[in-house]
Amino acid sequence: MAGLRIEYKDPRGLNPRARNPRIHSAKQVRQIAASIAQFGFVSPILVDSTDGIIAGHGRVAAAKLLGMCDIPTVQVDHLSPAQIRAYVIADNKLAENAGWDRNLLALELQELSVELHFDVAVTGFETGEIDILIGELGQTEPEAADNVPEIDRSKPAISRLGDLWRIGEHVLFCGDALDKISYRSVLGSKKAQMIFTDPPYNVPVAGHVSGKGKVKHREFAMASGEMTSADFTKFLKATFDRLEACSIDGSIHFICMDWRHMGEVLAAATSYSELKNLCVWAKTNAGMGSLYRSQHELVFVLKSGKAPHINNVELGRFGRNRTNIWSYAGVNTFGKDRDAELAMHPTVKPLNLVADAILDCSKRGGIVLDSFAGSGTTLIAAEKTGRRGFGIELDPYYVDTIIRRFAEAYEIGAVHTQTGQTFEQMSAKQLTLKGARGEKEKEKKSKSKIKIRKIKRTSKAKATNGRPQRRKGR
């Protein structure tokens, strides 16, 4: 056999085999095209002396899809027509006879999903399949991932309105979910791939969320029972408009709500293209209630835009079987972490509930946005699932809580983007300033006491015309 020589040819001049038994779907051709766009055309097409394709029909179709004019080819002229026909079959079938070491494959995919700055699905594996493979590694999730530091409101918060924090691959902004500036600050020109958010339910925390136990929460900054039905609908509508404007076409939005306000959510969601489903979080224990104690919450699954939505479930194709009944324990379940979870936020959602929703409708490395970040469960779930969590939270104390939660669970520190300082540095600075203010206050009080004593002595002297008083009985 003579030495092989690469020759570049126009793919439109190459002739597909009339009896090629290998079928390439349009989806697979798009996948091959994505691979070529990412890695280049690194595998030449095998052709015969008449430019008939021997191996590489899918790559030729992908090259045409990409509009390529020159692709590498190698002419095979040492095989008989019968041998060529046999090789066409062997080239495809022999590759199918190989297997995968699923553990090593999962490790490679897991590391690549962190290292690469593009969709790891370019490897040919679907996102849902990759998530399942990585999940099979059986890595132990840090216990602290479900725990949240208790908020101490007796001390001033470190964060302030307008602060933008970067926490590893995640971004957190302290601001109003109704303000355009908040979204510009946290996202810039990027768009979210998926939304998971838990707006306030427009019910008072006292009597509905916080009962007569030792854990008491202050009311939310907004929509904590003070709004009429019309006002709350307007509030939700404004929120949804902001979320739709900053998410990709075809994105899925998971909106949490209680049964009292189903009507307002549906009335506010008219701009969404579709209500995909209504999921029910079925808790293991009942909470508060009047006639019936509440043992569920609702998650509205809304679609924004007309483009195909991301579906990693695919009716259990890769072993991911999901229904619209989500069974997870609530914080009212008696357990070792119950008090800590209750203390961190009045309406905290289970980490796995949010993580599973993220796995359903987003890709690895994609942006998941939460405009009511609360205790940060969505951002923590994004870290757990290999996504990027972007959050907006109005309450500075909760912003601090999210930052501390990342530090405790994953040892990921936060950097204040406006100053470049870490959260620890800003905390230490606040303590230093507080100490300095305390010393000044002590000095001020000391001077004030000295001044008062001087005034008393002066007043006493004036009362006796400047003469010392004689002691009685002398």
In which residue ranges do the predicted regions lie?
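Intrinsic disorder/low-complexity segments
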Residues: A145-D146, I358, V415, K429, ...
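Core catalytic lobe of class I
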Residues: A2-V399, K445, K472-R474
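Short, solvent-exposed coil/turn linker segments
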Residues: Y8-D10, D152, P204, T422-Q425, ...
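Intrinsically disordered, Lys/Arg-rich low-complexity segments
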Residues: E443-R474
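S-adenosyl-L-methionine
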Residues: L161-S185, I403-K442
